[in-house]
Amino acid sequence: MEVTAKLRGAAISAQKVRLVADEVRGKSIERALDILTYSNKKGAVFVKKCLNSAIANAENNNGLDIDTLKVSTIYVDEGITLKRILPRAKGRADRISKRTCHITIKVGE
């Protein structure tokens, strides 16, 4: 049985989070949490939050034993992009893209 958790609208680009997601894909829950705890990437904070939610869902909603769980699927999709304006010299303006992403984690036995 697989249990899903989603984190939508995380304020970080999908490209940066995918680096962290590739590290924990297929690992056991305990190993994945260790990797995320000691990672120095900003995306690790968002992935760890979503993984803890998936663990809680598996334990409380489905009554699964968390010692036997592993990260079966993890993927990161692009969310909405917020467009912002940065004023420059001589009346010009640059566009700034504030990117977001959606993180989906499935844990199973």
UniProtKB/Swiss-Prot annotation:
GO BP term, pick one:
translation
Cited SUPFAM superfamilies: Ribosomal protein L22 (SSF54843)
Under PROSITE patterns, the record lists:
RIBOSOMAL_L22
Q: What GO terms are given for molecular function?
A: rRNA binding; structural constituent of ribosome
Q: Which Gene3D superfamilies match?
A: Ribosomal protein L22/L17
Q: Which CDD domains match?
A: Ribosomal_L22 (cd00336)
Keywords in alphabetical order: Ribonucleoprotein, Ribosomal protein, RNA-binding, rRNA-binding
Q: Which Pfam families match?
A: Ribosomal_L22
What InterPro entries does this protein's entry cite? Ribosomal_uL22, Ribosomal_uL22_bac/chlpt-type, Ribosomal_uL22_bac/org-type, Ribosomal_uL22_CS, Ribosomal_uL22_sf
Q: Which GO terms describe its cellular component?
A: cytosolic large ribosomal subunit
Q: What does this protein do?
A: This protein binds specifically to 23S rRNA; its binding is stimulated by other ribosomal proteins, e.g. L4, L17, and L20. It is important during the early stages of 50S assembly. It makes multiple contacts with different domains of the 23S rRNA in the assembled 50S subunit and ribosome. The globular domain of the protein is located near the polypeptide exit tunnel on the outside of the subunit, while an extended beta-hairpin is found that lines the wall of the exit tunnel in the center of the 70S ribosome.
Indicate the family of this protein: Belongs to the universal ribosomal protein uL22 family.
- Describe its partners and assembly state: Part of the 50S ribosomal subunit.
Q: Which PANTHER family match?
A: CHLOROPLAST 50S RIBOSOMAL PROTEIN L22-RELATED, LARGE RIBOSOMAL SUBUNIT PROTEIN UL22M
How is this protein named in the record? Large ribosomal subunit protein uL22
Q: What is the lineage of its organism?
A: Bacteria, Pseudomonadati, Pseudomonadota, Gammaproteobacteria, Moraxellales
The gene for this chain is rplV
